[in-house]
C-alpha cells in the first residue's frame, strides 16, 4: 500500500533516529528536552508492499489521498505507542543519571561531614590537651608557691626563735652514742705521756675519729659545707682547756661547734695555732714544713700512732700513710720554714697543732688500715668562684661523654690516699697493695659509670714533669722525683686532676688483674696448636671492654677444653697478646711524652725505650705481611712468633726475650670446613628496661641458636672463629662519618677521639622515650648508651672476619650468628633494629682489601633490605637479589619495588622479587623454590660471583605473625635454598643472621642452613610441596619480575612459560630437555666420528706421527 517515496522517506529517517540508543549513559544531560519526534522504526507488518512505515510527512501527504480509515487509525495508534515508549525510555535514562549524580553528591557530602567532624574532634582534643596543660601548670605553680611559703615560714620561725630554744634535735641513736662515749671516757685515767696520748685523751677524740660510726659528734650545717675542724692541742694540759668537750656534751650547745667553725674559717692568717707558751711560727707566711728525713723522725711529726695524725692540703706532705710510712703529694709547693724557727729532726712533734683550711677541697688523710674508705670525704670549696668553675668543667665533661667527678660524683667518697701518687723508692709494697685495695673498694661503690679519662693525656697535677713510670705493668713499683721538683704545680681544685689520679690507679689494678688471668689461662693455652691471625688493634678500645671480654673468655674456658688446633684456643691466646700490645703501646706513649720534656730520669728511660723500640720494630715488620691476595691463605700477624705467656712474668719485656720474625714462622692452619662466629659481647645490646617480652629483637635470639647448634652436635663439626670489633674506618666504607661516630662510640672510648668530630653527633643525638621506660632511636630500635655501640661494632667485625677467611680459602663457608641485624641501616639512618649494615660493609671490604671482583648478595629476609640496596644501587660489581614481602609498598619498609633495577652503571644489578597479595594465601615453600628456579639461580649463574653473602633473615618461617612476617615457609626449605647457593662461587657462601624473632623458627632454620653448609644430607621436601603449584599472586609477581629483568638478563626469558607448573612438572620438563640436548649432542658426535674414520681410511697416517696429533673424538 505504501509508495516507494514513503519507503525512501522512512529509510532516510532511520539514521537520525538510530543515534539515540548509541548515546552513552553518562553523556546525557540532566535537563533533557523532549521533542515530538516520531519513531523511525515501524513494524514490517504495518506497511504495504514497500515493507516500510511512512514518515509523518508522508502520513500528512497521504491524508489527501484515499486510504482505509481503519488502517489509518491503526497506524496512528502504532506511531503513538512507539512515541510513548521512546519518551518512557528517555525518562528512565534521565532518572538513572539523576540517581547517579545524587549518589555521588551524597558520598561527597558524607566525606565532607566526616572530615569536618574529624577536624572538630582534633580541635576539641587539642583544646582539651591545652586546658589540661594549663591546669597542670597552674597546679604546679600553686604547689611551688605553697612550697615557697612553707620555706619562708620555716625561715621566719628560725630567725625569730629564742636563744634558749634548740637549733637542732639530735636523734636517739646519737644521744645514746654520745652518752656511752662520755661515760667510757670519764672512767679512763688521763695519761701524761707525750708520745701516744692523743688517741686516749677525751679532748682529742674529734681529730682521731671522723664519722658517727666512731662516736664522733653530729655534723652541723647544711650539706656540702666542709666538716668542722677540731683544734687538738698535742701536749698535756689541764681541765681548764677542756672547754670544747664540755660544750659538745650537752645537746642544746651543739650550735657552738658551728660558731667555732665560722671562727676557724674567718681566721686564715696562719696554718699554725699559738702555743700556750707564746711560741709562734711565722704567722704572716703560709709555708709548709719540709721533711728532710725518713724513719721514726718522719712518722712522729703528727704526734700520734701511725695513721692517726691530722693533716691539711697545705701540709699534706706530712701525711701518714696507712702503714705508717710517709706519702707525698706532688701538687703542694714545699719550702723551708723561717730560719728563726727551723724544726730539728729530733724535736718533739707535739709542739705544733695543725688544722685544715676550709678554703680548699678538704680530704681527710692518714686513715688507719682498719678504717673503711668512707671515713675520708671529699668536700666542695665554699668559694663561689671555685664552685662555678667546677660546675662548668663538669658540664663540659658531660657534653663530651665523660662522667662527673669530684664534688659532683654523687655522695661517694674518694680515699685520702689517692693524693699520694708518687711513692718514694723505699716505700713498702704493702702500702702499694693497700692503696690498690682502697681504690678497688672505692670504685666498687660507684653508682655511675667508670671515669673515662684519656690514659695518654698529661696529668694536670704534674705540669712541671711528664707522666712518671706509674703506667708500667705491676711488675715494678713506680718511681718519682723528690718533692723539690713540684714547686710549680697548681693547687688540686681541678676535677680533671682527681680523674687522672684515679685512672692511673685503675690502670695499674687492671694490669695486675690481667696478668693473673693470663697465668690462669696458661695451663689451657700451652696445649694448643699454632697461633691464628691476630686481629687489628683498635686504639679507641678501653681496658674496661677488654676486661669484660677476658672474663667472658675465662667463663667459657673453664667449662670446655678446646681441642688441639682449634681456632677458639688460638684466638684466645691471640686476644691476650693483642691486649699486651695495647698496654705496652700506652706505656710507650707515656715514655715518649717524658722524653720530649727532657726530664726523664737516667735510670728509667733507656730500658723501656729499648724494649718498646724492639717491639715496635717487630710489628712494623709484621705489618708488611698484611696485604692479602684473593683466595689464598693470608699471611697474618700471627706468623710473627711470640713468646706466648712467658712474657707476662716480667714487665716490660726486654728485646732479648722476643724471637726475631724469621726464627720460627708459624703457618696459619684452619680446618677446611664451615666456620661459625659468635661473641657474647653482642648480648649486651638490650633495652635498659630489661624486659625482653616487649622487644622482639633481644639477646635470646642468638643465645638460642648457639645452644641449638651445640645440642645437635653441628657446632663440633664447625670451626669456631674469634670475632672482633670493627674499626670506625671500616664502618665508614658504607656509612657517613657522622653516623659512624653517632652510633659507634660510647662514653668508654669517646674520650680518645677527636672532640671536634664528636661535637656534632653527640650534641644532636636524639632518642625516643619508649613505653617500656627505655630509650631508642625510634619506637622499636632500642639503644643502650654503654653497650650498644660496642655490640653493633662487634656484629660487623665478626662477619668481616668470617667472610675474609672464607674468601681467602681458609674456610669452606660460614654462618655468622650476630645481632643486631643490619640490612635496614642506610648511609646515615638507623632503623628497623639496624644500626650498621654488616653485609654491605663486608662486601665493600672484600673488594677493597682482598680484591674480590664480583659479590652476590641474596637477601631472603621477609623485609626488604633498603640499606643494602642503597649502598650498591649504582655498583655493577655487586648483584643484590632480594625476596621480600612488598604488598605494593604497604609492608615495612615500603621499598623494593620490582621496577627498582639499579641506577647509572648499576642498572640491572638490583633484582627485587617483591611478593604481593598479602597473606591470603601466604607465600610458602613452593613460591620460594619457584623463585629460585626461575629468577635467582639463572641470574646468579650468569653473573658468576666470586663470593656469595646471604642476609639470612628467618622471619618468613612459619610461626611469625603478620606484622613481623605472615608467610609459611618451612625451615627445611631454607636448607635447600642454601644448598642451591653453594653451587655458586666455588662454594664460598657466608650467611649472616638478620631478622627472625620466633625462637623455635629461627633455631630450626639456622640448624637447616648449617647442615646444608656442612654438606649433611637434608630431609627431602614433602611430596605435597613438589606437587603443589604456585599461587596466582606469586605467579603474577614472578611474571612481572621476569618481564622487567629480561631486558638485562636474557636467561630468565625461557622460564616465563613454566611459572605455573609444579616443582615435579618443572623437574620432569627439565629432565626431558636435558635428555634431548644429550641425544642431539651424541648424534653430532657420531657424525663427526664417522667423518673422521672415513678420512683416516683414505689418507693413511705416517708412522712417525705422535699420538697427541690424532683428531679428537
Swiss-Prot record:
Residues 1-22, 39-63, 187-272, 472-494, 526-611, 1088-1113 are annotated as: Disordered. Residues 571-610 have a biased composition (Acidic residues). The modification N6-acetyllysine is found at residue 523. The modification Phosphoserine is found at residues 250, 488, 600, 650, 1099. InterPro entries: HDAC4/5/7/9, His_deacetylse, His_deacetylse_dom, His_deacetylse_dom_sf, Hist_deacetylase_Gln_rich_N, Ureohydrolase_dom_sf. Its main location: nucleus. Pfam families: HDAC4_Gln, Hist_deacetyl. A motif (Nuclear export signal) lies at residues 1072-1113. GO terms for biological process: B cell activation; B cell differentiation; cellular response to fluid shear stress; chromatin organization; heart development; inflammatory response; multicellular organismal response to stress; negative regulation of DNA-templated transcription. Residues 484-494 have a biased composition (Low complexity). It catalyses: N(6)-acetyl-L-lysyl-[histone] + H2O = L-lysyl-[histone] + acetate. Residues 238-249, 263-272 have a biased composition (Basic and acidic residues). Interacts with AHRR, BAHD1, BCOR, HDAC7, HDAC9, CTBP1, MEF2C, NCOR2, NRIP1, PHB2 and a 14-3-3 chaperone protein. Interacts with BCL6, DDIT3/CHOP, GRK5, KDM5B and MYOCD. Interacts with EP300 in the presence of TFAP2C. Interacts with ANKRA2. Interacts with CUL7 (as part of the 3M complex); negatively regulated by ANKRA2. Interacts with ZBTB7B; the interaction allows the recruitment of HDAC4 on CD8 loci for deacetylation and possible inhibition of CD8 genes expression. Interacts with RARA. This is Histone deacetylase 5.
Amino acid at each position: 500500500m505504501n509508495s516507494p517515496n514513503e519507503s525512501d522517506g522512512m529509510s532516510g529517517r532511520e539514521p537520525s533516529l538510530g543515534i539515540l540508543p548509541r548515546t552513552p549513559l553518562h553523556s546525557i544531560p540532566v535537563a533533557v528536552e523532549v521533542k515530538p519526534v516520531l519513531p523511525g522504526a515501524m513494524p514490517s507488518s504495518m506497511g504495504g508492499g514497500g515493507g516500510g512505515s511512512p514518515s509523518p510527512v508522508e502520513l500528512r501527504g497521504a491524508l489527501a489521498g484515499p486510504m482505509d480509515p481503519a488502517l489509518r487509525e491503526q497506524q496512528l495508534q502504532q506511531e503513538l505507542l512507539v512515541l510513548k515508549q521512546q519518551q518512557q525510555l528517555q525518562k528512565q535514562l534521565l532518572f538513572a543519571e539523576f540517581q547517579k549524580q545524587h549518589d555521588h553528591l551524597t558520598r561527597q557530602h558524607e566525606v565532607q561531614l566526616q572530615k569536618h567532624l574529624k577536624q572538630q574532634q582534633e580541635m576539641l582534643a587539642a583544646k582539651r590537651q591545652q586546658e589540661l596543660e594549663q591546669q597542670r601548670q597552674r597546679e604546679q605553680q600553686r604547689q611551688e608557691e605553697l612550697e615557697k611559703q612553707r620555706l619562708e615560714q620555716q625561715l621566719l620561725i628560725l630567725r625569730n626563735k629564742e636563744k634558749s630554744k634548740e637549733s637542732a634535735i639530735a636523734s636517739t641513736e646519737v644521744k645514746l652514742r654520745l652518752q656511752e662515749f662520755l661515760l667510757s671516757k670519764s672512767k679512763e685515767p688521763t695519761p701524761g705521756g707525750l708520745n701516744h696520748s692523743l688517741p686516749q685523751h677525751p679532748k682529742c677524740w674529734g681529730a682521731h675519729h671522723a664519722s658517727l660510726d666512731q662516736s664522733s659528734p653530729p655534723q652541723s650545717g647544711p650539706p656540702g659545707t666542709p666538716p668542722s675542724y677540731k683544734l687538738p692541742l698535742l701536749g698535756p694540759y689541764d681541765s681548764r682547756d677542756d672547754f670544747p668537750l664540755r660544750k659538745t656534751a650537752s645537746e642544746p650547745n651543739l650550735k657552738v661547734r658551728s660558731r667555732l667553725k665560722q671562727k676557724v674559717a674567718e681566721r686564715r692568717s696562719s696554718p699554725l695555732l699559738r702555743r700556750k707558751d707564746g711560741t709562734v711560727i711565722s704567722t704572716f707566711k703560709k709555708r709548709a714544713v719540709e721533711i728532710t728525713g725518713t724513719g721514726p723522725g718522719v712518722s712522729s711529726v703528727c704526734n700520734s700512732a701511725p695513721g692517726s695524725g691530722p693533716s691539711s692540703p697545705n701540709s699534706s706532705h706530712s701525711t701518714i700513710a696507712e702503714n705508717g710510712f710517709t706519702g707525698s703529694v706532688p701538687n703542694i709547693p714545699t719550702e723551708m720554714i723561717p730560719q728563726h724557727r727551723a724544726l730539728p729532726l729530733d724535736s718533739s712533734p707535739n709542739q705544733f697543732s695543725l688544722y685544715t683550711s676550709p678554703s680548699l677541697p678538704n680530704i681527710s688523710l692518714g686513715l688507719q688500715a682498719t678504717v673503711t674508705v668512707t671515713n675520708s670525704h671529699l668536700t666542695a670549696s665554699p668559694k663561689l668562684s671555685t664552685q662555678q668553675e667546677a660546675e662548668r668543667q663538669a658540664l663540659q665533661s658531660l657534653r663530651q661523654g665523660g662522667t662527673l667527678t669530684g664534688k659532683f660524683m654523687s655522695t661517694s667518697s674518694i680515699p685520702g690516699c689517692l693524693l699520694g701518687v708518687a711513692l718514694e723508692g723505699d716505700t713498702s709494697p704493702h702500702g702499694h697493695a693497700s692503696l690498690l685495695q682502697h681504690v678497688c673498694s672505692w670504685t666498687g661503690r660507684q653508682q655511675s659509670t667508670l671515669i673515662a679519662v684519656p690514659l695518654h693525656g698529661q696529668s694536670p697535677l704534674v705540669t712541671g714533669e711528664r707522666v712518671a713510670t706509674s703506667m708500667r705493668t705491676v711488675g715494678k713499683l713506680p718511681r718519682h722525683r723528690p718533692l723539690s721538683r713540684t714547686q710549680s704545680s697548681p693547687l688540686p681544685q681541678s676535677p680533671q686532676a682527681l680523674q687522672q689520679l684515679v685512672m692511673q690507679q685503675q690502670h695499674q689494678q687492671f694490669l695486675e688483674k690481667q696478668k693473673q688471668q693470663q697465668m690462669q689461662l696458661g695451663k689451657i693455652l700451652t696445649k694448643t696448636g699454632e697461633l691464628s691471625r691476630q686481629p687489628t688493634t683498635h686504639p679507641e678500645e678501653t681496658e674496661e671492654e677488654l676486661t669484660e671480654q677476658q672474663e667472658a673468655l675465662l667463663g667459657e674456658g673453664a667449662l670446655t677444653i678446646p681441642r688441639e688446633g682449634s681456632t677458639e684456643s688460638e684466638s684466645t691466646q691471640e686476644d691476650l697478646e693483642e691486649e699486651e700490645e695495647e698496654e705496652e703501646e700506652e706505656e710507650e706513649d707515656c715514655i715518649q711524652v717524658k722524653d720530649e720534656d727532657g726530664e726523664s730520669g737516667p735510670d728509667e728511660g733507656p730500658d723501656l725505650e729499648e724494649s718498646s723500640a724492639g717491639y715496635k720494630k717487630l710489628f712494623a715488620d709484621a705489618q708488611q705481611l698484611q696485604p692479602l691476595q684473593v683466595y689464598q691463605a693470608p699471611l697474618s700477624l700471627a706468623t710473627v712468633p711470640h713468646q706466648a705467656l712467658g712474657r707476662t712474668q716480667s714487665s716490660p719485656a726486654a728485646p732479648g726475650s722476643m724471637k726475631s720474625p724469621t726464627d720460627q714462622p708459624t703457618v696459619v692452619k684452619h680446618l677446611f670446613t664451615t666456620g661459625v662466629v659468635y661473641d657474647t659481647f653482642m648480648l649486651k645490646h638490650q633495652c635498659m628496661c630489661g624486659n625482653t617480652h616487649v622487644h622482639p629483637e633481644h639477646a635470646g635470639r642468638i643465645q638460642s641458636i648457639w645452644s641449638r647448634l651445640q645440642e645437635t652436635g653441628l657446632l663440633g663439626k664447625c670451626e669456631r672463629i674469634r670475632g672482633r670489633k670493627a674499626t670506625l674506618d671500616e664502618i665508614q666504607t658504607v656509612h657517613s662519618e657522622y653516623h659512624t661516630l653517632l652510633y659507634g662510640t660510647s662514653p668508654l672510648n669517646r674520650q680518645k677521639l677527636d672532640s671536634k668530630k664528636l661535637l656534632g653527633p653527640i650534641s644532636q643525638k636524639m632518642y625516643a622515650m619508649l613505653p617500656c621506660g627505655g630509650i631508642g632511636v625510634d619506637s622499636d630500635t632500642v639503644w643502650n648508651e654503654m653497650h650498644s655501640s660496642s655490640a653493633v661494632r662487634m656484629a660487623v667485625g665478626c662477619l668481616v672476619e668470617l667472610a675474609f677467611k672464607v674468601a681467602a680459602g681458609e674456610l669452606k663457608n660460614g654462618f655468622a650468628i650476630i645481632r643486631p641485624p643490619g640490612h635496614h641501616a642506610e648511609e646515615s639512618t638507623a632503623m628497623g633494629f639496624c644500626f650498621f649494615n654488616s653485609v654491605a660493609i663486608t662486601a665493600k671490604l672484600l673488594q677493597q682489601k682482598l680484591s674480590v671482583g664480583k659479590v652476590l648478595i641474596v637477601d631472603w629476609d621477609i623485609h626488604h633490605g633498603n640499606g643494602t640496596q642503597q649502598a650498591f644501587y649504582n655498583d655493577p660489581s655487586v648483584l643484590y637479589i632480594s625476596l621480600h614481602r612488598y604488598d605494593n609498598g604497604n609492608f615495612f619498609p615500603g621499598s623494593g619495588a620490582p621496577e627498582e633495577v639499579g641506577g647509572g652503571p648499576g642498572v640491572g644489578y638490583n633484582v627485587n622479587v617483591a611478593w604481593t597479595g598479602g597473606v591470603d594465601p601466604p607465600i610458602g615453600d613452593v613460591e620460594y623454590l619457584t623463585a629460585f628456579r626461575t629468577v635467582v639461580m639463572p641470574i646468579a649463574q650468569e653473573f658468576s660471583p666470586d663470593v656469595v653473602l646471604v642476609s639470612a633473615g628467618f622471619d618468613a618461617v612459619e610461626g611469625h605473625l603478620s606484622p613481623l612476617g605472615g608467610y609459611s615457609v618451612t625451615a627445611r626449605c631454607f636448607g635447600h635454598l642454601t644448598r642451591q647457593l653453594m653451587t655458586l662461587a666455588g662454594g664460598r657462601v657466608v650467611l649472616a643472621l638478620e631478622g627472625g624473632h620466633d625462637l623455635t623458627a629461627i633455631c630450626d632454620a639456622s640448624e637447616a642452613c648449617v647442615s646444608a653448609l656442612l654438606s649433611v644430607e637434608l630431609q627431602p621436601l614433602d611430596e605435597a610441596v613438589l606437587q603443589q603449584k604456585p599461587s596466582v599472586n606469586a605467579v603474577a609477581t614472578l611474571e612481572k619480575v621476569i618481564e622487567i629483568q629480561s631486558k638485562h638478563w636474557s636467561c630468565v626469558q625461557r622460564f616465563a612459560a613454566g611459572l605455573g607448573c609444579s616443582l615435579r612438572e618443572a623437574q620432569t620438563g627439565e629432565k626431558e630437555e636435558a635428555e634431548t640436548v644429550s641425544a642431539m649432542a651424541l648424534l653430532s658426535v657420531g657424525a663427526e666420528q664417522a667423518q673422521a674414520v672415513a678420512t683416516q681410511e683414505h689418507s693413511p697416517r705416517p708412522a712417525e706421527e705422535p699420538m697427541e696429533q690424532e683428531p679428537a673424538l
